[in-house]
Amino acid sequence: PYKDTTREFQWKKMKERLSLLESIQKEPFQWAILQNYKNRNGEAPLVKVFKRDAYKRVSDTLGVERYQSVPLYLLTDTVIPEIYGRDGSLVRIKAMDEDSKFARIQTVYDGEEEWYAPKKYIKQIGDTVVFDKAIFVDRHNQNIATLEHVGSKWLVRSMNPATTGQHRPPYAQETPLGMYVLQEKKSRMIYLVDGSKETGGFAPYANRF
């Protein structure tokens, strides 16, 4: 129990996602991460159909914001992107032509769809990487669980309460659903007071997906 709510760990959903993680590794693939943290690789072009979300930011029809995202193009049209891919998302590389500025990729979370993405937004991580650790963030129950694959079993390494993002425009945003690769570890992560550049505090031993 926590205040007026009861938190629980959704083991059934975790089991389903662990099965997915195992299944995508049964055959060797060239893996990659979509990267555009803080638009470091360039602001993504406007998609064909866009809107302003509750934060007054440009987003695609699926609600993915343009800011720090990666433009994804239909296989039949590399002029204007169709949707945005989230920074940190795990993808497969299906084709990488040296003479093209695009790579053909395939998503692995919530459907296997193929897209073209500009190479400058893609970080290759090879075909020998093994995903044997998983961190589950539960937005509803506000908790986090870490598991490790040892032998033929997934072992629970930690279970803790966690404060995830909340949908509170114009500043606070909910943690987006998806399958992300750990990109950065920090001894401390500084956060700001909403709507200002004033430091609000820090979180120790933070991981950025």
Regions from the PLM with identified roles:
Residues 79-85, 171-172:
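Short, surface-exposed secondary-structure edge patches
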Residues 119-209:
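Gly/Pro-biased beta-strand-loop elements
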Residues 66-67, 98-101, 137-143:
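A short, compositionally biased
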Residues 65-77, 125:
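Short, structured beta-strand/loop micro-motifs enriched in basic residues and often containing a Trp
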Residues 43-68:
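Short beta-strand/loop turn elements enriched in aromatics
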